[in-house]
Swiss-Prot record:
It comes from Shewanella sp. (strain MR-4). PROSITE patterns: RCK_C. This is K(+)/H(+) antiporter NhaP2. One of its GO terms (cellular component) is plasma membrane. It is found in: Cell inner membrane. InterPro entries: Cation/H_exchanger_TM (IPR006153), FAD-bd_PCMH-like_sf (IPR036318), Na+/solute_symporter_sf (IPR038770), NhaP2 (IPR023729), RCK_C (IPR006037), RCK_C_sf (IPR036721), Transptr-assoc_dom (IPR005170). Belongs to the monovalent cation:proton antiporter 1 (CPA1) transporter (TC 2.A.36) family. NhaP2 subfamily. Keywords: Antiport, Cell inner membrane, Cell membrane, Ion transport, Membrane, Potassium, Potassium transport, Transmembrane, Transmembrane helix, Transport. Its main location: membrane. PANTHER family: K(+)_H(+) ANTIPORTER NHAP2 (PTHR32507:SF7), NA(+)/H(+) ANTIPORTER 1 (PTHR32507).
Length: 574
């Protein structure tokens, strides 16, 4: 490649990336996933589009996609709170293993019938499209205030179900590539254990070593993110090299680092945020360039049947069967999880495996994977907001600071500065600072008024439009935001939790005459907390609800995992 070709490559690449970024606001206006915009730009620039760029280098696409996916998973792991595992780990693992196997089997049978394939070839198609995609799930759920049990289950599933899909895909390719090979139970069991076992061991072990290395190093601030990124990629590659799941490993590395006091954590997250956007744009641009839309015309009708069969039948059946042991999921939760079986880059990456292995019919597998991904993003991704509203799993948005930044005085420092702008309707307007009930361990460090810095004292009175810089830790964020911030306006806020709020220490006997409750010996001595535990189990989450004696009871407040208050909706409002 000469200098002119290199410059042309840079020019075209930068132009496509810039166009993708500038078109990103269109996704919110049209209600379609932003990843679809990036993919569309790549397709339009490709062989069948106005750009006319001929790109058929599957090895390069495989390299770019794996690198991008690794970065996305590292960032996603660092932003996942380990506390969410309390309510979502086992359901997510059930979906990541049994769910993928069930989806693969049903989709494989449909593919074999629709495309007149051998049953093993059909199963290979099912394995390729059998797992949800972490990049798509993290991107579309980011910033949404979902029921914690549902949101965490979807995120953990998407970060941990790829080993099962890779295991099934690689196994079936080995069998189809060797006519003498057999489906040995011991061979499959060993491969399965290697994928998950090595992935978990290297992810957690490597994450611990990388965490120690980061905290012991004294580097320029900008170098910590490079150390984390390079270390994560080393663990990802080592896991893949040894036969484990690199995808699972790097997700666990991010999870470990994100939930430990890590030096430079905030600057690392800021850099990774930008890297994740670059990765998403680059990955979907390259995959879009790789696709020749005219190749999909021959398979569009059976392809639609396969995609909708997976969306409407295979995925829901897999979810309902996988979640049977977990009674805490309501029917609405299960339907929403079924609908958010988003496919994205991973199926396309897996579809490259048969191409690189030289299997007969590999182009069909690739085209089918691409077709299923397009339908999934268009149908499931575009309807995500509507589905969340209908399933009632989206919570009213929480009040948050307008910005937050770390105060990394010590390697293990968890101090942050939260910035709030006071609106006119906050009760603290006109009140002196000494009368505010601030959470323990927090302090107002500065007050800005009309672009002027004030030196706050106990007698300083707050005014509308004041900007407050508050020093505190993440554990105090909810209390501080409720005190100073303003949640985004939405019509659903007043109705979601109900019009009446009850402290969980109140006895049902005291509520009986007010709400017409009929109590017996078993319920007469119960408190509201006892009722919630009896109906929802030991791990309720915000927004959980149940129907009892014609009233809708909604978990409206939690503190350290304990329900503090409950909202009540009357029958006419439910």
């Amino acid at each position: 490649m000469d200098a002119d070709s290199i410059n042309s490559f840079f020019l075209i690449g930068a132009l496509l990336a810039a166009v993708s970024v500038l078109l990103s606001p269109v996704s919110s206006r049209l209600g379609i996933p932003i990843l679809l915009i990036f993919l569309a730009v790549g397709i339009l620039a490709g062989e069948d589009g106005p750009g006319g760029i001929l790109f058929d280098d599957y090895s390069t696409a495989y390299l770019v996609s794996n690198l991008a996916l690794a970065i996305i998973l590292l960032d996603g792991g660092m932003r996942t709170r380990v506390a969410s595992f309390r309510v979502a780990l086992w359901p997510a693992l059930s979906l990541a293993t049994f769910g993928v196997a069930i989806t693969t089997s049903i989709t494989g049978v449909m593919a074999a019938w629709l495309f007149d394939l051998h049953w093993l070839q059909g199963l290979l198609v099912g394995a390729i499209v059998g797992s949800t995609d972490a990049a798509a799930v993290f991107s579309l759920l980011k910033g949404r205030s979902l029921n914690e049990r549902v949101g965490a289950t979807l995120e953990i599933e998407s970060g941990s179900n790829d080993p099962m899909a890779v295991f099934l895909t690689v196994t079936l390719i080995a069998i189809l590539g060797n006519v003498d090979a057999e489906l040995s139970a011991s061979f499959m069991l060993i491969s399965f254990i290697k994928q998950f076992g090595l992935g978990i061991f290297l992810g957690l072990g490597g994450g611990w070593l990388l965490w120690k290395l980061v905290n012991l190093s004294k580097l320029a601030e900008g170098l910590y993110s490079i150390l984390v990124l390079s270390g994560g990629l080393m663990i990802y590659a080592a896991s893949n090299k040894l036969g484990g799941s690199g995808i699972l490993s790097i997700y666990l590395v991010g999870l470990f680092l994100g939930n430990k006091p890590t030096r430079g954590r905030h600057s690392i997250l800021n850099v990774l945020d930008g890297m994740t956007w670059v990765s998403q744009i680059g990955m979907f641009l390259v995959l879009g360039l790789l696709l020749t839309p005219s190749d999909l015309l021959d398979i569009w009708l059976p392809g639609l049947a396969l995609a909708f069969g997976m969306i409407l039948f295979a995925r829901p059946l897999a979810v309902w069967l996988s979640l049977l042991p977990f009674k805490s999921f309501s029917s609405r939760d299960r339907w929403f999880i079924s609908w958010v079986g988003l496919r994205g880059a991973v199926p396309i990456i897996l579809a490259v495996f048969p191409m690189m292995a030289g299997l007969p019919g590999a182009q069909l597998y690739f085209n089918l994977a691409f077709f299923v991904v397009l339908v999934s993003l268009l149908v499931q991704g575009a309807s995500l907001t509507t589905a969340a509203r209908l399933a009632k799993v989206e919570l009213p948005p929480k009040p948050l600071p307008i910005s937050r930044s770390g105060v990394e005085i010590y390697p293990s420092s968890e101090w942050e500065v939260f910035v709030y702008r006071l609106s006119e309707n906050k009760w603290c307007i006109g009140e002196p600072l000494k009368r505010l009930s601030m959470p323990d361990g927090t302090r107002i460090a500065a007050v800005f008024r009309h672009n002027t810095l004030l030196h706050p004292s106990g007698s300083t009175c707050l005014e509308a439009g004041d900007i407050l810089c508050v020093l505190g830790q993440e554990k105090s964020l909810e209390a501080l935001s409720n005190l100073f911030s303003q949640a985004p306006e939405t019509k659903e806020v007043p109705r979601f939790f109900g019009d009446f709020f009850i402290d969980t220490e109140v006895k049902l006997l005291d509520l009986a005459p007010i709400y017409g409750l009929e109590l017996d010996e078993a319920t007469g001595d119960m408190t509201v907390a006892d009722l919630v535990a009896a109906e929802l189990g030991s791990h309720p989450v915000l927004g959980d609800q149940f129907l009892w004696q014609s009233l809708h009871w909604v978990v409206a407040g939690l503190y350290e995992g304990k329900v503090t208050n409950v909202g009540i909706r009357l029958p006419a409002e439910a």
